[in-house]
């Protein structure tokens, strides 16, 4: 008879693991396949067993309560100014009154304030005018002084000129004839002639 072939099994557990799709007994896939059911973490069990609720839920509840309690304020409460109002500079708005519309209760007091302001402005203008007048007077005084000095100098010069002329006239009359005679006699030398040089 011919010998019959028998199938030899090298690994006894290979048939079991073939269904799972792996041949290794201690592989990760096997452990995953076994624990594919409901997985529960140990940390969660420990916190839940203590009885303390998770922190994330607390924060969420706080935010929800804050959102519910948030109040909506009106424009009057916030103090937002109304548009299209012309207000003078430096006037502070009193609470509950229109800004820049009513300045003073009494008309007389308002007029006195206005008169004081106008007086200050006039005083400033007057002081400027006074300064200008004073400067003009100072300029005129300086000009007059300068003219006086020039006139004195002119008078001194004219006196000096007249004195020199008188001396010339007196000296010319006395020495005129004597000079001519001396020049002729030879005692007083005549003016020497200028030397001239001619080039050929």
Swiss-Prot record:
Biased composition (Basic residues): 190-200
Top-level lineage group: Eukaryota
Keyword Transport: yes
Protein location: Nucleus, Nucleolus
Biased composition (Polar residues): 1-12, 23-38, 48-62
Stretches with biased composition (Basic and acidic residues): 135-159, 170-180
A GO cellular component annotation in the UniProt record: nucleolus
Coiled coil start-end: 130-170
One BP annotation, GO: ribosomal large subunit biogenesis
Principal subcellular localisation of the protein: nucleus
Disulphide bridges, residue numbers: none
One Gene Ontology molecular-function label: mRNA binding
Residues covered by region (Disordered): 1-68, 135-200
Keyword list, A-Z: Coiled coil, mRNA transport, Nucleus, Ribosome biogenesis, Transport
Family (UniProt): Belongs to the LOC1 family.
Subunit structure: Component of the 66S pre-ribosomal particle.
Functional description taken from the UniProt entry: Required for efficient assembly and nuclear export of the 60S ribosomal subunit.
Protein name, per record: 60S ribosomal subunit assembly/export protein LOC1
């Amino acid at each position: 008879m011919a010998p019959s072939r028998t199938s030899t099994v090298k690994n006894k557990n290979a048939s079991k693991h073939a269904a799972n799709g792996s041949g290794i007994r201690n592989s990760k896939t096997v452990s995953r396949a076994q624990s594919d059911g409901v997985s529960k973490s140990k940390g969660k069990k420990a916190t839940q067993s203590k009885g303390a609720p998770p922190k994330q839920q607390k924060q969420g509840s706080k935010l929800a309560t804050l959102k519910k309690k948030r109040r909506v304020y009106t424009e009057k409460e916030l103090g937002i100014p109304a548009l299209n109002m012309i207000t003078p500079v430096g006037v502070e708005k009193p609470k509950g009154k229109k800004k820049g519309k009513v300045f003073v209760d009494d008309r007389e007091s308002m007029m006195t304030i206005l008169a004081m302001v106008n007086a200050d402005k006039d005083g400033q203008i007057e002081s400027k005018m006074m300064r200008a007048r004073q400067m003009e007077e100072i300029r005129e005084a300086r000009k007059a002084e300068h003219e006086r000095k020039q006139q004195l100098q002119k008078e001194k010069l004219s006196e000096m000129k007249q004195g020199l002329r008188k001396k010339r006239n007196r000296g010319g009359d006395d020495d005129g004839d004597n000079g001519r005679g001396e020049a002729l006699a030879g005692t007083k030398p005549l003016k020497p002639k200028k030397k001239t040089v001619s080039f050929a």
